[in-house]
Amino acid sequence: MRLREIFARDAAERDRAGGKPLEQLALLKESGLLNLLIPTEFGGAGERWSTALKIAREFAKVDGALGHLYGYHFGSQHAAHLRGTAEQAADIFRRSAAGNWFWGNTANSFSKSLFGRRDADGFVLDGFRPFTSGSHIADYLQVAWEDRDTNARSFAAIPANRDGIRIENDWDASASAKPEAGASPTPGSGFIETRYSTTSLTAGVPIRP
């Protein structure tokens, strides 16, 4: 694989130096691999999950962080298909393919630290979510939060540059990169009065295969 060989050339140096893998992300976007699993009718390649996972493993052989990011991208990209309506999934797929979006997530199910409340226009979130893979270089995010009163969990798909979102560079567990420099694939994300309309919700129907 051409990209695997390119990533291998300086993986160790990049790991030591830290920083966001923006050049590598640009290569992924140019290759079309970010849209690999989006159905062809929505502008993607329509490939199988087994193909995407094979590619993620190949990347991980030479660069663990990039393999991590590439694999997690697809889970967030397909969240609307799993949890939303068919119409929501189609809309997300079309816009993601057209924009060549890279996806991150802030949906760590083990953390009860991000809460939402309803207002006239939708929801307002406050709190923090650790282990938010890919959020530091993402175009779009899958977000999950709990209701303070009911503990009910909600999901949404929103732009990563939404006002009120602050991406931290604080992951320090896997020893895969220098977290203080932003190279870690799993930083935390803070939300301060971050607003979401009800149209961005991607939950409320049974999970679909």
Residue spans of the language-model regions?
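Glycine-rich flavin
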Residues: 22-25, 29-30, 35-137
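Glycine-rich beta->alpha junctions and the first turn(s) of the following alpha-helix
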Residues: 174-176, 181-209
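DPxDG-like acidic metal-binding loop motif
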Residues: 128-164, 180
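N-terminal capping segment at the start of a domain
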Residues: 3-11
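Short loop segments at secondary-structure junctions
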Residues: 84-85, 120, 146-149, 160-162, ...
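Glycine-rich, charged/polar anion/phosphate-binding loops
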Residues: 168-173
